[in-house]
Design a protein with these regions (language model features):
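Ferredoxin-reductase
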Residues: 1-33
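Gly/Ser/Thr-enriched, mixed-charge loops and adjacent short helices
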Residues: 25-114
Length: 114
């Protein structure tokens, strides 16, 4: 969601993993400013289109593929919310989540923080 809003994309699709079997994996769809796309704001129309069997029109203009390292912009965004946590004991399990990419950058190397 961050990248969609920060870079001004018109829409985004995230492929989501699941702890359930593979057939339950899915997609998170958002539009400009990372606003969610739900059943009433577009997903219902997509469902109807697919179920109708109509062909999808071909875009008049080809898109482009860009590789962007979102981390360089996302970390400063996260750090804006870091307060004075001295006196707090924080337990965190980032397991296989994306937060694991930023834990050391935010909390440092002090083992008591993990």
């Amino acid at each position: 969601y961050f990248g969609t809003a920060f870079y001004g994309f018109n829409a985004s699709v995230q492929i989501t993993a699941s702890h359930n079997p593979a057939e339950y994996n899915g997609m998170k769809v958002s539009r400009e400013n990372a606003l969610p796309v739900g059943y009433d704001t577009g997903l219902g129309q997509i469902k109807e289109w697919i179920e109708s069997g109509r062909e999808c029109p071909v875009a008049q203009k080809r898109g482009e593929v860009r590789q962007i390292d979102v981390r360089k912009d996302y970390l400063p965004f996260l750090l804006k919310y870091k307060g004075d946590w001295s006196g707090l004991k924080i337990a965190m399990d980032v397991s296989n989540g994306m937060a694991s990419l930023f834990v050391r950058d935010i909390f440092g190397d002090t083992p008591s923080w993990y």
